[in-house]
Amino acid sequence: MSMQDPIADMLTRIRNGQAAKHVSVTMPSAKLKIAIAKTLKEEGYITDYAVADEAKPVLEITLKYFQGQPVVETIQRVSRPGLRIYKGKDELPKVMGGLGVAIVSTSKGLMTDRTARQNGMGGEVICYVA
């Protein structure tokens, strides 16, 4: 069976892994998934990520907990293959009043909503993380 939305699968693996208190989760690797993992690490939502170079590359994400509770409260896919969501620089959403982040795909690469606003760029809203 082919995977229709690999990004939604990645976010679901992170959500389920934290609900089950796993130390890390693994998934098939892709450039966009690595960019999302890098952004999540920079924002402090995951501890680390690594790509294992095998016949089929595997992305391993080390999950982060604070006092036994998952750091990621919600992680939600916004733009999907059947319905792409694009926002201009003035329309970019603030997740939880600025406490969370929206990951946005711009012409300059993947970045948070804050960075995109500072650079005066809009783009495709990939997901919300809080």
From Swiss-Prot:
GO molecular function: rRNA binding; structural constituent of ribosome
Superkingdom of the source species: Bacteria
PROSITE patterns cross-referenced by the UniProt entry: RIBOSOMAL_S8 (PS00053)
SUPFAM superfamilies: Ribosomal protein S8
Region forming the signal peptide: none
GO cellular component: ribonucleoprotein complex; ribosome
Pfam families xref list: Ribosomal_S8
The entry's keywords: Ribonucleoprotein, Ribosomal protein, RNA-binding, rRNA-binding
Any Gene Ontology biological process: translation
Assembly mode: Part of the 30S ribosomal subunit. Contacts proteins S5 and S12.
Primary role: One of the primary rRNA binding proteins, it binds directly to 16S rRNA central domain where it helps coordinate assembly of the platform of the 30S subunit.
Family: Belongs to the universal ribosomal protein uS8 family.
UniProt-recorded name of the protein: Small ribosomal subunit protein uS8
Organism of this sequence: Shewanella woodyi (strain ATCC 51908 / MS32)
